[in-house]
Amino acid sequence: MRKNRTYSLLVAGSLLLFIGGLFCLPGEITVSNNVYGKELPIQSVETEEKKAVLTFECAWDHSSLKDILEILEDHNVRAAFFVTGDWVKQYPEDVRRIVQGGHDIGNHSATHRNMVQLEKEEIEKELKETHQAVKELTGKEIKFFRPPYGAFNDTVILTAKEGGYLTVMGNIDSMDWKDYGAKTILRTVMEDKELQEGSIIRLNSEAKYTKEALPKLIESLEREGFRLVPLSQLLYQEAYHLDVKGRQIPDDR
């Protein structure tokens, strides 16, 4: 009896391994943000080209946005703007200008709440509200998510993933929100030891000195050989994994 039971267990185990193998065939698309059992956001991207991305968070004010968009246009640079649902509702024309300028739009939640403090259903609601608001205005589907305050845990990232989002933070923080001045913003970014191919640079559209620092920041990055591209042209949408620093690496490397 015990022998038959052992045999049955072995057969069942082999069958499970076989079925599992069907879903892990070589060449299958895989996407993993899990590193040593913890879900991580994308911080930067492994790339042979010297590319980087400027990303802006839009949650409160919009007074500098027009100037920022003009500066980007003057320098022929496309960036990414992470917007909250409240901001979208308050400044719909700015959302349209962002999209018309060829920039990427990202989800920054609906109300800029700390996602870690929310239940899964509340996180889903925050994401859906912003997604729907942007889609109704522009017809665009959002693919990227940045949690407010840089606060995340496994639930936040997995919930975003279930909604079709890549969670993106950034390995270079300009600290422009501290309002120390344009020169400090420039120095903070350009002297960061993590600045490299595939860097994602974080800025705030409403910070006091961001628009003043932006022209010199773009020129300094380009002088160092960086090509500034939209987020959608840098990130891998599939077949990738992350290292311990959140660097996105294609599975064939």
Question: Residue spans of the language-model regions?
Answer:
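Alpha-helical scaffold elements lining the catalytic groove of polysaccharide deacetylases
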Residues: 62-64, 113-141, 151-197, 210-213
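Active-site beta->alpha N-cap acidic-glycine motif
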Residues: 30-114, 118, 122-126, 131-133, ...
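Active-site beta-loop-alpha junctions enriched in small/polar residues
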Residues: 59, 84-86, 110, 150, ...
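Short low-complexity, flexible loop/linker segments enriched in glycine and/or proline
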Residues: 95-97, 121-123, 183-186, 242-247
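N-terminal Lys/Arg-rich, disordered targeting/topogenic segments
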Residues: 1-6
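C-terminal domain-boundary segment and adjacent tail
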Residues: 26-28, 36-48, 74-76, 87-89, ...
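Structural recognition of the beta-strand scaffold that forms the well-ordered cores
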Residues: 53-55, 79-83, 104-107, 143-146, ...
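Hydrophobic membrane-insertion alpha-helices, especially the h-region
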Residues: 8-25
